[in-house]
Curated annotation (Swiss-Prot):
One of its GO terms (biological process) is interstrand cross-link repair. This is Exonuclease V, mitochondrial. It is an enzyme of class 3 (hydrolase). Belongs to the EXO5 family. The keyword Methyltransferase does not apply. Its EC number is 3.1.-.-.
């Protein structure tokens, strides 16, 4: 104990005030807020250089989840795919950034160019539908309705109506993403051969450095919201493409699917075929089975550059490749690539867990604004499904149908939502609120076709995130036998919007396994961060003024790192 006390006198701050760098000092000592925050968070004397190891007992992932400038990461701890690419530039810089509180990065011209190019590519393939005015109008009308209810109707016999009017914004956002960037995009992939901006996710176990791959692991939750055995990792795939690598002109799979759709789905709304997803998903499985030996999915990421020149850093080029590998890995998990059993449905339970870790109830009915927005954007896919839910019919996905069959369903009063005027009138409080008439005036689209009497009634099964998870899972599972090992990184000129180079790679489980281990041991704090040997990178780093690497103070650093870590472990034991 005496040895520990002596060490603390020499190596730890004598009191909290002496360890923290004040705001006035930061102006003199540090040229930026990131350095100030890092010194304050690590309780370092302002005169010291930055250590190469973490002097606290909080792992990078735990710190990232508890102290983050983005509040959403504190509410719902998670990592993005890019955060797993720890050595794409300099791991030590990434390490410092995490412990500085993950300050928000500045939006540069290069970032803006990249976002614009990605949007251009997305909209070329997926026609955008602007629903902002629809959502604004619905939200305004519903806000008025809620105020009217609360102010004038004291005895509301169905209080659930208020939740159907005004829902959870996090649930609404997730519902819009799953409906459009999973279900709609995967429908595009299987019917037209390609899709852009597709959602994928997985759960990474930082203890064993592997992605969770079993339903039992998904259901095994740890107390608290920071569970290192099940870290949510999310990504958006720039481009999926199904192709016959031996004959790129072969479109037989898609012709057969199109012929099937034209024959069996002859009902249209507007200019779109209305699809019965229950029948579609069952039939397309057969087409995939017949063509699986010839076709495969290629995973591509798009990078933008201001000039027609590749990055000079090998680590940046390698990180771009590994990013596609992570996407391919997670897509494989969601599609049941290695567990091709009829009743596994890993994606379904993974999606439910995805919502749970975000603190979202998957059985809470979607609010009216979200429901109508989903229907407006992709009525060709959801109209008949919503009719099934309204009638209490099964959708053809056993886990979802069984869950609803064995459960008392409170339903969903869409007739009450759109009949608020009548409800208020019956309560002796007349009020005019014809929502359908109001939204019909917004654009050249007939909302009466999608908000028909088949839907404007009391639904027997409420529309929920659980329903969307079920349909998402079925679409992911379509690709279990179409997953290829080809990935690519396309480099586009942000100024000319032209692709100038494509790097092709071959995905292997061994390579992604090694990358996952490297990322996991970084985030769980089991290894030291690796600093860059390319000192030109230091010119772009906020931590350069106090980092030992560019300031040539690394002599004997390996000894100091190992000794420092041992001392730190001893002090905190």
């Amino acid at each position: 104990m005496r040895a520990k006390s002596i060490l603390k006198q020499f190596l730890l701050p004598r009191d909290k005030n002496s360890s923290e760098v004040g705001k006035s000092d930061s102006i003199e000592l540090f040229p930026n807020d990131s350095l100030h925050s890092l010194y304050a968070n690590w309780h370092l004397p302002g005169s010291h250089m930055l250590p190469l190891y973490n002097p606290t007992n909080i792992s990078p992932y735990e710190f990232h989840s508890r102290f983050n400038s983005d509040q959403s990461y504190k509410r719902s701890p998670r990592l993005s795919v890019t955060k797993l690419l720890t050595d794409r530039w300099c791991e030590l810089s990434e390490y410092y950034t995490i412990y500085a509180g993950s300050p928000q990065f500045k939006v540069t011209n290069a970032i803006t160019q990249g976002l614009e190019r990605h949007s251009e590519l997305e909209y070329e393939l997926h026609q955008p539908i602007d629903i902002s005015l629809l959502m604004e109008t619905l939200s305004g009308s519903i806000s008025d309705a809620i105020s009217h209810f609360q102010a004038t109707i004291k005895d509301v016999k169905d209080p659930d109506l208020l939740s159907e009017l005004d829902g959870n914004p996090d649930a609404a956002k997730l519902a819009m993403e799953w409906s459009d960037h999973s279900i709609n995009r995967l429908f595009s992939l299987i019917t037209t051969s390609e899709a852009r901006e597709v959602l994928v996710h997985g759960f990474l176990n930082l203890e064993n450095s592997e992605f969770v791959s079993s339903i039992d692991e998904l259901k095994n939750s740890q107390n608290g919201n920071i569970d290192i055995r099940k870290v949510l990792v999310s990504g958006i795939v720039d481009h999926f493409k199904i192709e016959n690598l031996e004959d790129p002109t072969d479109l037989s799979l898609f012709r057969e699917i199109r012929d099937y759709m034209d024959y069996y789905f002859d009902t249209t709304i507007g200019d779109k075929q209305v699809i019965d997803l229950t029948k579609f998903l069952q039939s397309v499985k057969q087409f995939v089975e017949e063509h699986k030996s010839a076709f495969s999915v290629k995973t591509t990421d798009v990078k933008t550059r201001s000039v027609n020149r590749l990055p000079s850093s090998i680590s940046v080029l390698e990180a771009a490749k590994f990013q596609t590998f992570y996407y391919r890995k997670m897509f494989g998990l969601l599609s049941n690539e290695h567990q091709r059993t009829e009743n596994n449905h890993f994606a379904y339970y993974s999606l439910l867990e995805n919502a749970r870790v975000r603190g979202i109830d998957v059985d809470e009915p979607l609010d009216i604004v979200t429901l109508v927005s989903i229907l407006r954007k992709n009525y060709n896919l959801f109209y008949l499904d919503f009719v099934k839910l309204a009638n209490g019919e099964p959708i053809g996905f056993e886990p979802f149908d069984s869950y609803n069959k064995g459960r008392e369903n409170t339903g969903f009063a869409l007739d009450s939502v759109f009949g608020i005027a009548e409800k208020c009138l019956l309560a002796g409080k007349p009020m005019q609120l014809d929502l359908i008439e109001k939204i019909n005036s917004l654009e050249d689209f007939n909302y009466d076709e999608i908000l028909s009497p088949d839907l404007i009634k009391n639904w027997k099964t409420a529309p929920t995130l659980r329903y969307l998870a079920a349909r998402c899972a079925q679409f992911y599972e379509l690709f279990s036998e179409l997953l290829g090992d080809h990935t690519a990184v396309e480099y586009h000129n942000g100024r000319t919007s032209q692709a100038f180079h494509t790097s092709e790679s071959k995905y292997t489980e061994d390579v992604i396994g090694e990358q996952t281990r490297k990322a996991s041991t970084f985030w769980n704090g089991k290894r030291f961060p690796i600093y860059t040997r390319d000192l030109s990178k230091c010119n772009y780093c906020d931590f350069k003024p106090r980092c030992m690497v560019p300031n040539h103070q690394l002599q004997g650093d390996l000894y100091r790192k190992s000794l420092g870590a041992k001392i730190n472990e001893f002090l905190h034991s």
